[in-house]
Amino acid sequence: MPTITSYFCLLLAALTLTLALFIGLSKRQLI
């Protein structure tokens, strides 16, 4: 099912982006 794969890929991308943003903010506050 391409729809499920597409949805999973989008969810994974969103999770990675959120995690990267959180790490970036943490590093910025740490300095």
Curated annotation (Swiss-Prot):
Name of the protein in its database record: Cytochrome b6-f complex subunit 6
Organism, scientific name: Cuscuta gronovii (Common dodder)
Top-level taxon of the source organism: Eukaryota
Keyword field contains Transit peptide: no
Subcellular location: Plastid thylakoid membrane
GO BP annotation list: photosynthesis
Assembly information from the UniProt record: The 4 large subunits of the cytochrome b6-f complex are cytochrome b6, subunit IV (17 kDa polypeptide, PetD), cytochrome f and the Rieske protein, while the 4 small subunits are PetG, PetL, PetM and PetN. The complex functions as a dimer.
Membrane topology: Single-pass membrane protein
InterPro entries xrefs: Cyt_b6/f_cplx_su6
GO CC entries: cytochrome b6f complex; plastid thylakoid membrane
Protein family: Belongs to the PetL family.
Protein biosynthesis as UniProt keyword: no
